[in-house]
Amino acid sequence: MSQSIKIKNALISVYYKDGLEPLVRLLAQQGVQLFSTGGTEQFIKDLNIPVTAVEDLTGYPSILGGRVKTLHPKVFGGILNRRALGSDQEQIAQYEIPEIDLVIVDLYPFEETVKAGGSESDIIEKIDIGGISLIRAAAKNFNDVVILASKDDYSTLQQQLEAQNGETTLAQRKAFAKKAFHTSSHYDTAIFNYFNAEEPLNVFKHSINQAQTLRYGENPHQQGVFYGDLEAMFTKLNGKELSYNNLVDVDAAVALIDEFEEPTFAILKHTNACGVASKPSILEAWNVALACDPVSAFGGVLIANREIDLATATEINKLFFEVLIAPSYQPEAVELFRAKKNRVILQRNEVELSKKQFKTLLNGVIEQDKDLIIEGPEQMTAVTEKAPTSQELKDLYFANKIVKHTKSNTIVFVKNDQLLSSGVGQTSRVDALKQAIVKADAFNFDLKGSVMASDAFFPFPDCVEIAAEAGITAVLQPGGSIKDADSINMANEKGIAMVTTGVRHFKH
């Protein structure tokens, strides 16, 4: 088996030419014969570097509007022939096929064309045939051939050739092949998912190019990696790298804050809101949100849907927190936060988020649509003798937005666009209710005149009875229990309003 191989012949055919010139010049200096196609051939000629057209090698012109350029035995024979196999070498000599030691190729911008909203005919024309075939052939024969399928590898190969007198090692070629198969598999997955958008086949195929190694996973003894493009979603203005737990909380925070249009601040801990308020100014929203549970807010993730000015930053700066997220910041606010180097300050970018959720379990993956609907006053049906007031309806809507994003079983209390307290992640609904009452009392909230939202129906009337005795005047629940009538009758007996939405919002 061969080890070090000196590059004598190279085939170069790329869609994007940026970054290519230094490597091409080095290959020419080292006496490598270059073969190329179309625009790449002209690019090399413009550098005053000798290059042979692939058409001259094959004896065939580019045909079918450029669909067929490199698909020819004289090209693929030169790539796939095994240098150590006598029969291959005999055939190469018989048909006068030059051995190609290096293939530099990229792929048509299929994903970019889809994202740009191109027509189906434009998208189809960006399905690369020759390029993907060259990648697979060269990567398959890594024992004898170098494959570069990404401009990110140009400088790496250049350094190797300069240091090794124009040669590459087997280990280096195998590493390039691994990257090339990643490129080809990602490309094919993107094409499949485009075709699978309508009447999808029941298969799971996803590919993400970007990855970020995390400090650790959920706990220090666990390893963690984030697959995705964080830089597209956020601009980090300050702080250390995000941890696994930070990312989980940031995801929950973004999902929650996007429910609100008015100036709103939310504080989260372990994905659950411990403070939410909507007020005329973001400063007031911060102060009111913090008052919900200033104890749990310590070390939390904070998110706002308005610019953070210096006055608001000054108040936030009094609290120890892990992450702050906002659409923008006044420069003076950023400078204030940078006084503590580890605090993460993120500025949100305009990015469309996925509408799907995935979770690994057992030996597989489950997928579902994200819970993206929310029921407002128009979708609330009064089922009691007493109808909710306009303010109660407004607060019920506010509470419904929060309960949707809180771990089940959950109960949420709200008054005047402020979260008063919540019971979170309990194994029974009545326990969630009791927890919420205890928390409200701990922070001196009077529940009289407040409203309650439940993420699922009441199996028994006890929750309604306890809530009414605590001062709740209106209740929201999805309904759907075979004992709905018992809870409705209890609400009527206690003289409070109840609405149903018909939509459950479990969150696990």
Q: What is the meaning of each model-derived region?
A:
Residues 321-343, 465-508:
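C-terminal binding/interaction regions
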Residues 152-160, 164-335, 339-370, 392-401, ...:
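Active-site loops and adjacent core secondary-structure elements that bind or stabilize anionic groups
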Residues 83-132, 136-138, 381, 387-390:
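Active-site/ligand-binding-proximal alpha/beta "capping" segment
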